[in-house]
Structure formats: structure tokens, C-alpha cells
Amino acid sequence: MMKRTSLIGQLGQAQQQQTVTLQGWVSRRRDLGGLIFLELRDRSGTVQVQVEPDSPAFAEADRLRAEYVAEIEGTFQPRPESQRKGGLADFEVIASRVKVLNAAKTPPFELDKGESVAEDIRLKYRYLDLRRPEMQRALMLRSKAVTAVTEFLDAEGFIQVETPMLTKSTPEGARDFLVPSRLNPGEFYALPQSPQLFKQLLMIAGFDRYYQLARCFRDEDLRADRQPDFTQLDMEMSFVEQDDVLEVQERLLAHVFRRVLDVELPLPFPRMSYFDAMDRYGSDKPDLRFDSAFTDVTGLFRGGEFAAFASAPSVKVLVAPELTRKQIDELERVAKQNGAGGLAWLRRDGEGFTGGISKFVGGIAPQLIEQTGVAQGGTLLFAAGEWKKAVTALGAVRLALRDLFDLAAGGPQFHVSWVVDFPQLEFDEDSQSWTYMHHPFTAPHPGDVALFGTERQGEMRAQAYDLVMNGFEIGGGSVRIHDPEVQAKMFQAIGFSEEAAREKFGFFLDALEYGTPPHGGIAWGFDRLLMLMSGAGSIREVIAFPKNNRGADLMAQAPSPVEDAQLAEVGVQVRGE
């Protein structure tokens, strides 16, 4: 085997009429008029190779089939004018020597039709799927993003520290993946859902600024933007307030987009309170590439003819284009799936309305038209009831309309914003108790600390913030509690006894007593961010070896049974269903 002269994608005008040696995979072979035409591919690009019948390379080239590994030596030259398509397609290699480096079985699917192949087949043969240029571009984009993150944070004085992968099971929201300890029978480690406590301990230890591309594990239901094992870009800073954290994050994200995509994100990012996001868009991660904010018409219907709205705590309306009855029925299905009892509607006709609940709104039609600005033929969609249920359901309808009419197409490619001032606590109807909205180490606004233990503790605002892009939460963080007394009040508010808190978090509570600095941080969902940056439809497209939506690795066939002897060693017995 000879040493290659370059990657295929490095060839260009400067290499014209030079002898080159290339190595890669045969994407395609064509036989035409006695000539053999090959497309040779490596990670950087594809080039056409022509083998003439009188060439000493012909016999060896005749052995080549799809996905064979080959070494080609020949002259790099322009293709005939009529065959040029721009870039590398303007050139070809006239082969003088061909060597088959390895044969290949016929692939189970055509690589150039990969996106039309069932995903389970692609995942089973992931090593072949990853040969596709689209997949290689996605993973190279990921590598560039890691480099951009590292160079920025290193320059800003952050220190990269690795935290444990085997740790203690603590309540963090999702189920833990548990690992039995062979040396301590009956006891278990947990794989980390996040490095939350360890990064706070690093601030207590005096490291001032920390970051890590952390592997995290959560045993939860999966969807397009979730995996059981995933990557967070985790960061923490000492002696900071909320604005300090947000300012660094804005510059970091702008740097990543500039270096990786050559896209300038406008700074600073707009901020919106949790209440405003929910009240106007029905989501704590609103897609702001398009507006379509709700209008509150509670007062307009109060005491009116339509009983369902007359006494409703909240009535919200969303303006939509003209809709067919079939489309309205589909949107009503979306609303019901998200907690609404139904989806009332009206269609504007002149200075009034037809359809839906039109017989109940004759007297308020002018006010509805004025307040909503609905166009002729346009549709009004209503949700009514308890505030959070109403706005959440209408928020789901808003996103369905976005997809139906491609409403985001008219906005920026990327819209980034902050959602701030989340509630510190939320009331769980099932358990009839208060619980944390983010995690129990989130600090409340200083002016709200006095509300702990009072009837108004549900009004407390957290110093928590989410970074939102195109309707996805790509990061979330908070200023942390650094005062042991405030931490005790937080545990008390969520029903954690002192004994329970000690059992779960004793090591951390001890550390808080040894001079904890004010600190705050954030974690990015790195896979989710890369999904958005690359335009992929799923985070599985930006992860080299992902699980499917059932949490299975179809290539490695994991999870899988293990030997009884292995289970016995760690004291585990599998029960039947």
C-alpha cells in the first residue's frame, strides 16, 4: 500500500495534471463503451475515476464493486467542458494503477438512498450508514463545535474537570440507571443524570470556573430529541449573579455559531419571563421564529351568552389562516391531547363570524375583530378553562399550525432567547404537595426568600433560566443556593425531612457548611443543539452510535441478557414479569 498524496476533498485547481494517489471506498461503478467509471469516496469528498481498456489498471479495476476499498493512482485533470458540474465534479482521475485493498459484501441498503431506508435498518448497520456524506458532515460539525466550545471556555478561564460516572442515586426527576456493586452486595451505584452536585462541589473547592462535556444517563421515555445516554455541555461559575452567567453564555453560543456555521447571532438575546412565555405562546420554550401570540379575551366573554366561556377563569384566542373543517378537526384533536376539553372556533365573514360558536358572539364581534386583527376568511381558535391548561393546549395548537402552514419559514433560521423567572415551586396535584420546578438547589430571587413556609410560597420566583432556540430548550441553569439555611428551607418546602435530606445529600450539605461562594451555572443539551445547527430531524442524526426510540442499540444488540453467573456475582436475581 502506498501513501496517499491527499484526501479527495483537498484536490483542486492546484493539483491539475499532477499524479495523485487516493484511497477510499467505491461509491458507484459504471461500464460505458469499454471504459470503467468509478466514484471514489473518502470522508472529505468524492471524485470520478476513469479507467481505460488499454490501461494496466483495467484488470484490477474490473474487480471493484460497491463499497470495495481501493487505492487509485492516476492523473488529476479537468473533465470535458460539457460534463462539468462545479467543484470536484469539474475534475476526474485517469487511473494508471488500481489496487483492491479489500472486498466488501453487497450492502443491505443503497448508501446514496439512506434517508429513504427504514431507520432501524440504518441503525442496525450503523457503520455503513456513517459512510454517507450527510452523516459524516453531521459528525464533523459536532467535532468543530467541540473545538469552538473548548477554545472559548479555555480563553475565558474555565477549567475542564471530569466528574464521576459511578455515583450515588439521588432524586433528580428521571429514573436512574443503576449499577450493582460486586464488592458491596445489595448496594448500587447510579449513572449520573447530570454532574449537578459535583460541579457545585468544585465551586466550593475553589475552582472558580468549570466546564465539561459530560455524559449523562436518564431512564425516561424517549422521543426525537432524547436518548438514554446523552451529552451535556456543563458549566459553573463562582462569584456571579444571573446576568453574569447569561452574558458569558450569549458570547459562547455566538462564538460557536460563528466558527462552525459562519452565522452571526444578534446579541444580546431577548428575555421573556416564564409567565409571559406561557401566557402569550403556551410554552416555556416558545418558537419565536414566528409571532402568533395569543390574545386574552376573558373579560370580553365574562357573563356573556356562551356559558362555557362566561365563567371560565381564562379564555385565550389564537388567530389562524382560513382553515378547512378537516384541519379544524385535526387541531381540535391536538388540543384534546394536550388537556383541553375541545377547541372552539370562528371564521370571519365580513364584519361578523360564521361557523363554530358564531351564534354566541354576535354582540361582541366588532371587539373580537379589533382585538385579534383577524383577516377576512381567517379563523379564531379558542381555549378556555384553568389558565395553565388553556394556554398549554393552545400552545400545542400554535405549533401544529406552524407545521401545517410552515409559519417559521418567514422568520430567521435561528431564533435564540432566554426564558427567566420560573416559579421556584409548583404544586403537584397527584401528591397534593409542593415540589421543585428545576431542582432543589436552585436559588429563589433574594426578595422572595421570606415567602418560604407562607401561603404565598407558590409565588416565589427562581433565579432559573432556560436557553431556547426554535422552540427547543437547548440549555437550562440557575443561580444556586449557597446559604445552608436557605437550602434547609427549600427542602422543608418540598416535604424533605432533615433525615431524608441527610440520607440523600448528606455529603453535599456538609460541604455547604465550609464556606460556599455565590455561584451559578448552566448545562446545554449538546446533542439537541447540534440537531438544530445541522438541520437534522432527530438527535440520532448527530450521534455516532445512538439508541432507537425504544432505547435499543440495534447494532450491538443492547440491552441483552447476561449469564446467570454474572448476575450471581453482583447479587442480582431477575424476576419474571
UniProtKB/Swiss-Prot annotation:
Residues the record lists as binding L-aspartate: E172, R218, H438, R480
InterPro entries in UniProt: Aa-tRNA-synt_II, aa-tRNA-synth_II, aa-tRNA-synth_II/BPL/LPL, Asp-tRNA-ligase_1, Asp-tRNA-ligase_1_N, Asp/Asn-tRNA-synth_IIb, AspRS_core, GAD-like_sf
What is one Gene Ontology biological process annotated in the Swiss-Prot or TrEMBL record? aspartyl-tRNA aminoacylation
List UniProt keywords, sorted A-Z.
Answer: Aminoacyl-tRNA synthetase, ATP-binding, Cytoplasm, Ligase, Nucleotide-binding, Protein biosynthesis
Q: Tell me the segments the record calls region Aspartate.
A: 196-199
Task: State where ATP binds.
Answer: R218, D219, E220, Q227, E473, G525, F526, D527, R528
- Reactions accelerated catalytically: tRNA(Asp) + L-aspartate + ATP = L-aspartyl-tRNA(Asp) + AMP + diphosphate
Q: Name one GO molecular function term.
A: nucleic acid binding
Localization annotation: Cytoplasm
Question: Disulfide bonds, which pairs?
Answer: none
How would you summarize the oligomeric state and partners of this protein? Answer: Homodimer.
Q: Which family does it belong to?
A: Belongs to the class-II aminoacyl-tRNA synthetase family. Type 1 subfamily.
Please state what the protein is called. Answer: Aspartate--tRNA(Asp) ligase
What species does this protein belong to?
Answer: Deinococcus radiodurans (strain ATCC 13939 / DSM 20539 / JCM 16871 / CCUG 27074 / LMG 4051 / NBRC 15346 / NCIMB 9279 / VKM B-1422 / R1)
